[in-house]
């Protein structure tokens, strides 16, 4: 199977600060020492992934819009929120919104709720692309900023998305080809691919 880098598979994370009215773009990337200590998280990892320090590992804890490593995702989100919103006060960061573009099941949604609570949110609101009453063609960024009108106490939002969805498509097709080969359906797979051309 074609090799994919953590940068290609990682989710893009956008953090919206409703107080300052600023949006920050991040990547779901982490670099850990093999002892378990996190070296860094987010965009800072991109340049380091190809020349990792000795005894360290780099990967994405959120892949294809889903949490693939809960503990690392929690540490990553804590660091990102602290970086952009400051250290949480005694009561935490207040109310947070999680906006996800992927279709998730209940268990996957709960993982995101738990992540935000563990990262310091006092309350968590969930939204996805099925939000009602949005005029067609409205950019998702405007929708997320506008959620403050519905949820007055929102302090921040975390959007899980993918700026280059073609990376996900390439990965999914490579996975499908690999599975078809394993299942003895390689010929059928190739036939279907030819039909699509």
Where are the model-predicted features located?
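Nucleotide/phosphate-binding catalytic cleft detector across ATP-hydrolyzing
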Residues: 1-25, 32-37, 45-197
């Amino acid at each position: 199977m074609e090799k994919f880098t953590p940068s290609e598979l990682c989710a893009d994370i956008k953090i919206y600060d409703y107080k300052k009215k600023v949006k920050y773009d991040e990547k779901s990337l982490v670099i850990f020492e093999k002892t378990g200590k996190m070296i860094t998280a987010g965009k800072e990892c991109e340049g380091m992934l190809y020349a990792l320090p000795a005894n360290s590992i780099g990967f994405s804890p959120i892949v294809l819009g889903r949490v693939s490593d809960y503990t690392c995702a929690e540490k990553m989100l804590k660091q990102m929120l602290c970086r952009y919103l400051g250290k949480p006060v005694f009561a935490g960061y207040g109310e947070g919104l999680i906006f996800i573009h992927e279709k998730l099941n209940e268990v996957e949604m709960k993982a995101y709720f738990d992540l935000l609570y563990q990262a310091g949110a006092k309350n968590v609101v969930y939204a996805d692309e099925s939000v009602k009453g949005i005029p067609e063609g409205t950019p998702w960024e405007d929708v997320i900023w506008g959620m403050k009108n519905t949820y007055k106490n929102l302090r921040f939002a975390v959007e899980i998305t993918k700026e280059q969805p073609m990376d996900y498509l390439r990965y999914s097709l490579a996975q499908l080809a690999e599975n078809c080969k394993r299942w003895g359906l390689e010929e059928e797979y190739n036939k279907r691919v030819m039909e699509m051309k």
